[in-house]
């Protein structure tokens, strides 16, 4: 997330590491600043992790053995967040606080010039965009074989944004965009 935020113009990290402690059966975060908190964790054999916050809030995270980032929600300074596991094993976590300024900067960058969708189906997307400042149009579509991109009717080689998404460079002005997907090998 921090790399993506930087690519989108944020000057600060979107997720900042905050101190946490882990021992057998429970990991603890002492909240020192109001904000949204998340946690990444090492592998567990338990399929469920339980969050308990000192304000009385609780939450269960199922399929924990699959591994994902836990959304711990909003917490206030002075709160204590505990993450417990039923197998009574040590689960090392890395806790993060969301930097809202970095999130807002990234959001504004993404939202400042958007494509207006004119049609879509399971294999074709068309739209228009009026570009005020030349840059890259990034799609929330995975960069994989099979996609062909047309800008103003001309086939354009797609680029990759953040090692994951389809992106195409655009000049100032109005553009017609078309993406067509054909299953590779057909």
Summary of predicted features, one role per range:
Residues 1-186:
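Active-site-proximal, structured, solvent-exposed surfaces of multi-pass membrane proteins
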């Amino acid at each position: 997330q921090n790399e993506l935020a930087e690519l989108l113009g944020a000057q600060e990290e979107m997720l900042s590491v905050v101190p946490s402690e882990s021992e057998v059966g429970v990991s603890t975060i002492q909240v020192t600043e109001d904000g949204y908190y998340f946690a990444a964790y090492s592998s567990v054999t338990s399929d469920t992790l339980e969050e308990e916050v000192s304000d009385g809030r609780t939450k269960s995270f199922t399929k924990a053995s699959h591994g994902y980032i836990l959304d711990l929600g909003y917490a206030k300074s002075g709160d204590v967040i505990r993450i417990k596991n039923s197998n009574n094993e040590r689960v090392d976590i890395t806790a993060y606080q969301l930097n809202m300024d970095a999130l807002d900067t990234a959001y504004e960058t993404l939202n400042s010039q958007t494509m207006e969708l004119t049609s879509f189906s399971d294999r074709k997307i068309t739209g228009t965009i009026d570009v005020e400042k030349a840059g890259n149009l990034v799609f929330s579509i995975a960069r994989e074989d099979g996609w062909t991109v047309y800008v103003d009717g001309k086939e354009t080689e797609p680029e990759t944004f953040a090692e994951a998404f389809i992106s195409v460079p655009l000049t100032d002005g109005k553009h017609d965009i078309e993406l067509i997907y054909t299953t590779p090998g057909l």
